[in-house]
A protein has these predicted regions:
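A domain-start/cap signature at the N-terminus of enzymes
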Residues: 1-105, 117-123, 131, 135, ...
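Active-site glycine-rich loops that stabilize anionic/oxyanionic intermediates
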Residues: 103, 111-115, 326
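Cap/lid segment of the alpha/beta-hydrolase catalytic domain
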Residues: 140-160
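Active-site nucleophile loop of the alpha/beta-hydrolase fold
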Residues: 141, 210-219
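Alpha/beta-hydrolase fold nucleophile elbow
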Residues: 177-189
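Short beta-strand/loop motif that positions the catalytic acidic residue
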Residues: 258-260, 264
Length: 367
């Protein structure tokens, strides 16, 4: 057993070491390892677009779904040192959906070594979308940006993919007439790390966030510190990290649903506990010392899951779920897809049940 954990540690270290390498060099690695897929993602970069690239239906629509699977790309505002900033994505419109009908939107951020297709298949989010009546947006990291398709969740926010994802969400919601009061965000691992950044830095776009196997916010500024955070959580007070990064008094708050595997050897469960405290802080349930200022904290266990709930006026604001026997994988997912497990409850269904009770009002308050 120790040898297995050590192997996971070095594999994780290798991933994060690659993350810190200069991005232009990634093109060489992509051509050697996966030329066909890289071409599919990188080709649109040579074609300018006003809002998004030419959409097309296809590219492995998730099995068992009856809606429309659209593949395209978005031209986000350029970042420093990057004249072109294209972001590939998949959009799923549930069966019977009509343009401008005010559907809710769930934004899904995949993890390392995943694609929009694999994440949709593993979480079964599109099948749920058909039943529940929401659209699904799956941004996809390019191999030209990271050889393992990891999102850059640590370090300088402006150099991460967060601004591009925020721009994509705005463009898609505007183009399809989605309900801006019901836009939700979810991610796993590196995708959960980026989702935390978006919820903290771009809170007005999202009514709630779901984080699966994600690192604590604001603790990592480099490759090596990111690896340490994943393995151990933050050595600093997580509440102090939030206060140092944000004006908590001006933050509108974002309800959060957090899922973590008990035996995750890649992202330690302490991260989930600390994330719970951070989101309780921005929702103003905790004070600057991390003490409960309003509401209550409830704990209970059911069906091999330990729950910690932050409740205010009888309303669930933050929930942390630790799934017994689960490693670094999506709970209750399709085990045929990497980083998904059939162990534990269906995390996507649990997140949606939480999401559907949250709305972002026009007054920028949660109702």
């Amino acid at each position: 057993m120790p040898r297995k954990k050590t192997s996971v540690w070095f594999k994780g270290l290798e991933l994060l070491t690659r993350m810190s390498a200069p991005r232009p060099k990634k093109k060489v690695a992509v051509r050697k390892t996966a030329p066909a897929k890289a071409a599919q993602v990188a080709r649109p970069a040579a074609k300018p677009a006003k809002r998004a690239g030419k959409a097309h239906v296809g590219r492995a629509q998730p099995a068992g779904t009856a809606g429309r699977w659209i593949r395209s790309y978005h031209s986000a505002p350029p970042r420093a040192g990057h004249l072109v900033n294209h972001l590939a994505y998949a959009l799923y419109l549930p069966a019977g959906a009509a343009r401008g009908t005010g559907l809710p939107l769930v934004v899904m951020l995949h993890g390392c070594k995943q694609t929009a297709e694999s994440f949709a298949a593993g979480t079964r989010v599109c099948r749920l979308a058909d039943r529940a009546g929401f659209a699904v947006l799956l941004p996809e990291q390019a191999k030209t940006a990271h050889a393992q398709r990891c999102w850059h969740w640590h370090g300088d926010h402006a150099q991460s993919e967060a601004p591009a994802v925020a721009s994509l969400v705005d463009a898609i919601a505007r183009e399809h007439g989605f309900d801006r009061e019901r836009v939700y965000l979810a991610g796993i691992s590196a995708g959960a790390g980026l989702a935390s950044v978006l919820a903290m830095r771009h809170p007005l776009r999202f009514a709630a966030v779901g984080l699966h196997s994600g690192p604590v916010f604001g603790a990592a500024s480099s490759t090596m510190t990111a690896m340490s955070v994943m393995r151990h959580g933050s050595r600093e007070d997580p509440v102090h990290l939030v206060d140092a990064a944000l004006d908590v008094a001006a933050h509108p708050g974002v309800p959060a649903f957090i899922v973590q595997g008990e035996i995750d050897a890649v992202v330690a469960r302490r991260n989930a506990v600390q994330l719970g405290m951070q989101f309780a802080r921005i929702n103003r349930l905790l004070d600057a010392q991390g003490e409960l200022r309003v509401g209550e904290i409830r704990t209970h266990s059911r069906d091999a899951v330990a729950y910690t709930d932050y409740v205010k006026s009888g309303r669930l604001v933050v929930r942390v779920c630790v799934v017994r026997g689960l490693g670094h994988a999506w709970s209750g997912g399709d085990p045929r897809e990497a980083f998904h497990s059939d162990r534990g409850p269906d995390a996507m269904a649990m997140m949606w049940q939480f999401f559907r009770r949250q709305h972002r009002s026009a007054a920028d308050e949660m109702v």
